Amino acid sequence: MRIENLQNENRKFAKSIGNFHVLEYVQDASVSPMNAMNEYFMSKMEVRRRQVVIDIDKDHSAIIQAGAMQWMGGNVQATSGVKGIGDLLGKAIKGAVTKETAVKPEYVGEGCLVLEPTYKYIILADIGKWGPAGMTIEDGMFLACDANVNSKVVARKNLSSAVLGGEGLFNLSLQGNGIAALESNVPEDELIEVILENDELKIDGNLAVCWSSNLEFTVERSTKTLVGSAVSGEGLVNVYRGTGRVLMCPVAPTTSLFESTNTMAAKAAAKSSNTFGK
């Protein structure tokens, strides 16, 4: 199979790591007179549709969110990845607590897999570079990953971090060697990467997008006394301790990642502009 014009003047690969590629639309050319102005200024602000393109072969299969596939070329087949009723129940529980789909299909074979377009920014992360413990991500960020990447639900070690930290009681952790495609509400170059070496990071608010799974996460007062916290006006802060990495978003709370530009909203926007609408 050969695709002649996957890239052209209006569609270009913005980023590629391994067999994962991000196809970005420079502008939305299929517009009506009613929304042409909005689409024009959206393109100028780089609010663009993006699609993940994954090369599938005997050495590379992919796991994606259910319903994220748009089209596939070649001898590519989808499998459920469910090994039994117990495995299905476990996946259902995992999906319920992390806001992810319960069953994520795995695509195998030889060919090309293209995912649904989204207005979110796509982060391609090399999970192996996050160490043996892997990385923990915000709810709703997972889009796809290499089949060699294992996912599991991690719970907070203490109640304070879950109740007061704003990050939830459970999160999805990715481990292994391979690439993962994550959906972000902000561009990757707006994220700040903090490298910790037996150190600590204190953040006022739930601004962490993803972090090394081996880091200890707690919620503490910004000062040693209640009076000091009251005077400083800072109150409680999220504290990450240990050795690892943290990606934080200083311009928008991460709680908006899933809520403001979720998949349904992206599809609704796509439908209104007559391009890839469903």
List the model feature ranges, each with a label.
Residues 1-278:
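Composition-driven recognition of glycine/serine/threonine/acidic- and proline-rich low-complexity segments
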